UniProtKB/Swiss-Prot annotation:
Function statement: Involved in bacterial cell envelope homeostasis. Regulates peptidoglycan processing by N-acetylglucosaminidase SagB, perhaps acting as a scaffold protein. Pleiotropic regulator of gene expression, probably acting via interactions with multiple two-component systems. Plays a role in the abundant deposition of the immunoglobulin G-binding protein A (spa) at the cross-wall, a subcellular structure that initially arises from cytokinesis.
Record's keyword terms, sorted: Cell membrane, Cell wall, Membrane, Secreted, Transmembrane, Transmembrane helix
Membrane topology: Multi-pass membrane protein
Biased composition (Basic and acidic residues): 282-299, 323-353, 379-418
Protein name: Lysostaphin resistance protein A
Assembly: Interacts with N-acetylglucosaminidase SagB; interaction is direct and facilitates peptidoglycan processing. Interacts (via N-terminal region including transmembrane domains) with sensor protein kinase WalK (via N-terminal region including transmembrane domains). Interacts (via N-terminal region including transmembrane domains) with sensor protein kinase SaeS. Interacts with other histidine kinases, perhaps via their transmembrane domains.
GO biological process: CAAX-box protein maturation
Entries under InterPro entries matching the protein: Rce1/LyrA-like_dom
Compartments, as annotated in UniProt: Cell membrane; Secreted, Cell wall; Cell septum
Residues spanning the membrane: 9-29, 41-61, 84-104, 118-138, 153-173, 175-195, 202-222, 231-251
Annotated stretches, region: Disordered: 274-418
Family: Belongs to the LyrA family.
Species lineage: Bacteria, Bacillati, Bacillota, Bacilli, Bacillales
GO MF, one example: endopeptidase activity
């Protein structure tokens, strides 16, 4: 649970203050065990230290919402799943321990006769309360704070070391203390993995696992009275289960990660050659645009030729209508001139058509050149404007020539009449 709202200084100070207060209170509260008159295997007064330390840190430091993020009491499907694991894993540890006792010793101790002068229900309630106050401080508060700056695995290591120091027992010698340290550290690592990704819903899981472990050990083993073989069996069994559970969890998460990534790549493949495909598509689009421009230019050339034909027909109609105005004049010589003019117009039309075709070819060549230089738009507009201008100029020249020919014919007719 990464949350960078808490500064690095406050994060470090919170962890330090919590640990110092917890250790100091655990030393001071030892004297109250005999005062309250409760046997230590029912309820350890020193276990109140983490709860008190957590409350003090919450009151002293700011960002209360972040500090209380691991103290949610709601239930989810994942919490129920982890609660089942919190009951199954202690059972597996106890089964391994009992099998080890039967294999390497005569038998395990069942319902010890020493120190069990109280009802079992009192012991069960006492262990549930001990588990709650300890895990409230270490898992629901401290691990939540540590996870704001590091992932769950490393946060579990940090909290596990602190919890092992808090639970250290040097009364029965160094070897006993070493195995007790291994047991409590493995115990804490399992708890850290159990509460992973529960979004602050940690207290039920941690309390269930803690109470199940301590309650079973009271009745099956005698490590609380300093038996070295018992603590050795418990420590090794817990370490084996911790390694197996955490390793299996990592493998499952790794497989899930790879499967999810593969599915995402199938949906949206990360193709590093996409830019090549984009270039090919761009070139294809440009080629299509170029061919379309060439076709438009050819159509423009054809329309120019048809325009010339229209101008020719208009000129012929004008020339044909003019002699009808002078029906009294002689028709031989004007008709001869009209035929010559018509032939001249046909020659001019042929020249104009040739020029139009040449103009279309030049436009086509110009468009192809412009497409290679990425300047097709401006040249296309210019090339489309030129045939239209040329059409207007040629039509005007043909009409002017026809008018001049008519005037000349009228003059010749008037001279002959005279």
């Amino acid at each position: 649970m990464k949350n960078n709202k808490i500064s690095g200084f406050q994060w470090a100070m919170t962890i330090f203050v919590f640990f110092v207060i917890t250790m100091a209170l655990s030393i001071m509260l030892r004297d109250f065990q005999s005062i309250i008159g409760v046997k230590h295997f029912i309820f350890e007064v020193t276990d109140l230290a983490p709860l008190i330390a957590a409350i003090i840190c919450i009151l002293v430091f700011k960002y209360k919402k972040v500090q209380l993020a691991g103290l949610k009491f709601s239930i989810s499907l994942k919490v129920i799943e982890r609660l089942l694991l919190a009951l199954i894993l202690p059972l597996i540890i106890l089964i391994i321990g009992m099998y080890s006792f039967n294999t390497f010793a005569d038998s395990f101790i069942l319902l010890q006769s020493t120190g069990l002068s109280v009802p079992i229900t009192h012991i069960l309630i006492g262990h549930i309360l001990m588990a709650f106050v300890v895990e409230f401080g270490f898992r629901s508060y401290l691990q939540n704070i540590v996870e704001t700056k590091m992932n769950t695995f490393f946060a579990s290591i940090v909290v596990g070391l602190m919890y092992s120091v808090f639970s250290a027992n040097t009364t029965y010698g160094t070897e006993f203390a070493a195995y007790n340290f291994l047991y409590t550290f493995s115990f804490s690592m399992i708890l850290g993995e159990l509460i992973r990704a529960t979004k602050g819903r940690t207290i039920y899981i941690a309390t269930t696992f803690h109470a199940s472990m301590t309650f079973g050990l009271i009745f099956l083993f005698s490590e609380e009275i300093g038996d070295l073989f018992s603590i050795k069996v418990i420590a090794i069994s817990t370490a084996i289960v911790a390694v197996g559970y955490i390793g299996l969890s990592l493998i499952i998460r790794g497989i899930a990660y790879l499967t999810t990534r593969r599915n995402l790549e199938e949906l949206e493949p990360n193709n590093y050659l996409d830019h090549v495909n984009d270039d090919e598509e761009t070139n294809h689009t440009r080629a299509e645009k170029s061919s379309s421009n060439i076709k438009d230019a050819e159509k423009t050339g054809v329309s120019t030729a048809s325009t010339v034909g229209i101008a020719k027909s208009d000129t012929e109609n004008t020339v044909a209508d003019e002699p009808s105005i002078h029906e009294g004049t002689e028709k031989t010589e004007p008709q001869h001139h009209i035929d010559n003019q018509t032939e001249s117009n046909h020659d001019e039309d042929h020249d104009i058509t040739s020029e139009s075709v040449e103009s279309a070819e030049s436009v086509k060549h110009t468009l192809q050149s412009d497409d290679l230089t990425n300047d097709s738009n401006e040249d296309e507009k210019q090339s489309l404007k030129e045939p239209a201008t040329y059409k207007e100029d040629r039509r005007s020249s043909v009409v002017i020539d026809a008018e001049k020919h008519i005037e000349k014919t009228e003059e010749q007719s008037s001279d002959k009449n005279k």
